[in-house]
């Protein structure tokens, strides 16, 4: 199994707490692929927004975060404390994956764990919205959520 952004046992519990669905290891890896892609998409747009402003650094305002995303971010913020998730580990992992030639503002760097974790929650919440009665995430659910996020995020 590839390196996980958030350790599997914690991610499993987060999905159960925030989305009321179970997550197995194989599907956790599939969700991680979606999260990495969506994170890259967010920062591609942020990079473009910063360049359009002739900014020398990517700031939070450059990242296209919707109201729904920000609400999910607050949900993840409450869970990250309960689960004792090590934010520094997430920051280091994500910093290696972000495309672009502009540096990130310190506030953006500090928010990387929240942004990243929120994408996991958004994937889970999209799955739950499409399949209210499911108890366990399956590969086909992740594919559906990916399609929705490709249009919206």
UniProtKB/Swiss-Prot annotation:
Gene3D superfamilies assigned to the protein according to its UniProt record, in alphabetical order: Histone, subunit A
GO molecular function per UniProt: protein heterodimerization activity
CDD domains attached to this UniProt entry: HFD_Aq328-like_rpt1, HFD_Aq328-like_rpt2
SUPFAM superfamilies: Histone-fold (SSF47113)
InterPro entries per UniProt: DUF1931, Histone-fold
Protein name: Uncharacterized protein MJ1509
Lineage: Archaea, Methanobacteriati, Methanobacteriota, Methanomada group, Methanococci
């Amino acid at each position: 199994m590839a390196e996980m952004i958030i350790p599997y046992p914690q991610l499993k519990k987060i999905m159960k707490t925030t989305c009321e669905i179970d997550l197995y290891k194989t599907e956790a890896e599939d969700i991680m692929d979606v999260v990495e892609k969506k994170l890259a998409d967010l920062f591609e747009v942020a990079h473009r927004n910063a360049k359009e402003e002739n900014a020398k650094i990517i700031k939070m305002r450059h990242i296209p975060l919707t109201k729904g995303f920000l609400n999910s971010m607050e949900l993840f913020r409450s869970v990250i404390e309960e689960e004792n998730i090590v934010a520094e580990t997430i920051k280091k992992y994500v910093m290696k994956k972000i495309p672009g030639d502009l540096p990130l503002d310190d506030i953006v760097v500090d928010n990387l764990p929240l942004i990243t974790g929120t994408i996991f929650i958004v994937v889970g919440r999209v799955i739950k919205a499409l399949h209210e009665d499911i108890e366990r995430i399956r590969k086909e659910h992740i594919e559906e959520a990916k399609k929705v996020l490709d249009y919206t995020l």
